[in-house]
Amino acid sequence: MKYLLLLSCSLVVAAPAWAQGPKPMTSASWLLCDEDGNNCGNVDGARTLLDDEITVTATGLWQRRDKIGQSISVITTDDLQAIQGPDLTRALERLPGVSFARSGGLGSQTSLFVRGANSEQLLVTIDGVRVEDTAAPSGGFDLGTLLSGGIGRVELLRGSNSLAWGSDAIGGVLALETDTRSGARGSLEYGAHNTFDANAGLGLSGDRYTLGLGGGYTSTDGISAFAGGAEADPFRQWHLGGRGSFGLTDSLKIVAAGRYADSKIDFDGYPGPFYNVFGDTSEYQTTRQGSGRFGLEYASSALTLGTGVALSETRRAYFDRSAGSAPSFETSGRAVHADITGRANLSDQWSIDFGGDADWSRFSTTFDPRQTARLVGAHALLGYHGDRLSLTAGGRVDDHDRVGSHTTLGANGSFKLSRDWRLRASWGQGFKAPTLNQLYGYGGNVALKPETSEAFDAGLEYGQRNGGGHFAVTLFRRDSANLIDYRFPAGYFNVSRARAEGIELEGGAQVTERFKVQASYTYLTATNRLTGKDLARRPRHMASVAADWTTPLGGLALGADLRLVGDSFDDRGNFTALDGYGLVTLRASVPLGAHLELYGRAENVTDAQYQTVAGYGTYGRSAYGGVRVKW
């Protein structure tokens, strides 16, 4: 039996905390949940599509994941709570095709590689706002500044998808949402290296409004960023965020979201007097990040429209205590984004998704005067969604006032072989416009062309993640061209070509009512096609296993995680090797009544010695414990 549901933006459906089931959802489209497909949930008598069976990264509008041919993974609120802790990379590394490199402890510069793509080729959004740092040399987002507190949902699309998202979506799209569960909640955690993490949130909803607010504070004495260092490099951050909506009519509503984070971290570098040997220094960095969006959304059975204006700004300052209290270097980046997106339902099976957007970005540094750029784009996708076959194809045109126009195409399809089996495939192009820093900063080159990519993947899936068992195998390839590289002293040039290809395996099973297991494995080759060398910090083998058991002892839950990473190289010449490693985490939690939960974990139980960036420290055996409350 099928139920037609209008999931209009920021409609919040309350779900019991610490329990599997439908999660808070936001959308702007008509969707079908299918009882036979095992993707319907029941909340307060309403039929809802389960949160991990919907996607926003495929087209920019909400869609059923089983109607899409692209590779998409979802991390839910329950997943984040089971994993525990402020380090979001511990959740992301469970996903296939994902590896990361970090220059020290929590809060340090963190790069996320999706299927071997450069970290800055991953588009990151928070509540629909693009949050890249336009003043960074390559314009990416530093995931070291993004903690899990206040995050309610994470979605990752693996593969080029500039058709829907424009510039930056070469490696994929990472979309995060603020937690908007109804009720009040809070958590406190303390552990190794004097690490303290506190978070609080509040969710309200009525007939015409929803509101989710949250904030948190994290601090740690940390570890030495320099692996051989004698002094620790501390980190602290406080953050605030919120998301809400108000219905003006049954079909039209106002939506708004905002986030602010203030961070400070010590780091190591090259101390005097010769500045040529890596070691302990007295340097630190402050980062202030703000983002927000205000818009309108209209939804009916025939037409969905959304429009809004968003702002993202990042300010960084670098200090050296040995040189005084004034900053030695500062950067400022800002981007304003305006967009309109929509879906016209032509019939029960045919639809057109469309949109237009404009970005105005600027950057400046201590040594570089302010520079600006404008990027305008429009796209359209024609979709067919039958009972068994779904096809989507479209095109996009972007115009950059500094580097000219660029056209992007893409297509994907899904075919349901039976109730539980489906085939899927996608082909997509990606591009990334040169950053203002690459055009006008130190070593800048105004003749740079956009980086481009062409990606293909094909897969076979069985079951659903929320069912008794699921399995997926995916083959993928991505060819990238015009990659921007820096050569001292000449500067930036379009010189590189790269290929990344491999296979992803993902599966899980609810073995018994109380025991479940999830696992993933990726084999990846990512090479520079000019030199034949492996791309730096891209391991060929990555695997993760997570097992969870809810015991009959008063709700006591036990869990274990295993992360295996193969060998890689730290540099483009493949001279410095990074040895593979294995990490084991043990987790536990127990409810104390209806409103209180105790939890704890031990990370790197075997005290493995490893590095993700040569010369930079990583955590040894560490233990943490905390408490959660809800009411």
Label each PLM-derived region with a short phrase.
Residues 348, 352-353, 385, 390, ...:
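Gram-negative outer-membrane beta-barrel transporters
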Residues 21-81, 89, 119:
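Short, acidic, small-residue-rich periplasmic hinge/interaction motif at the N-terminus
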Residues 40, 57, 61-64, 89, ...:
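Extracytoplasmic beta-strand/coil segments of soluble accessory domains associated
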Residues 249-251, 296, 347-353, 361-478, ...:
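Structural signature of Gram-negative outer-membrane beta-barrels, strongest in the C-terminal barrel
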Residues 5-7, 203-205, 214, 246-250, ...:
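Conserved C-terminal beta-signal and adjacent last beta-strands/turns
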Residues 209, 300-320, 416, 423-424, ...:
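Membrane-embedded beta-barrel scaffold of Gram-negative outer-membrane proteins
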Residues 162-163, 175, 182-185, 189, ...:
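Periplasmic-side early beta-strands and strand-to-turn transitions of outer-membrane beta-barrels
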Residues 130-158, 177:
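Short acidic/polar hinge/loop motifs at secondary-structure boundaries
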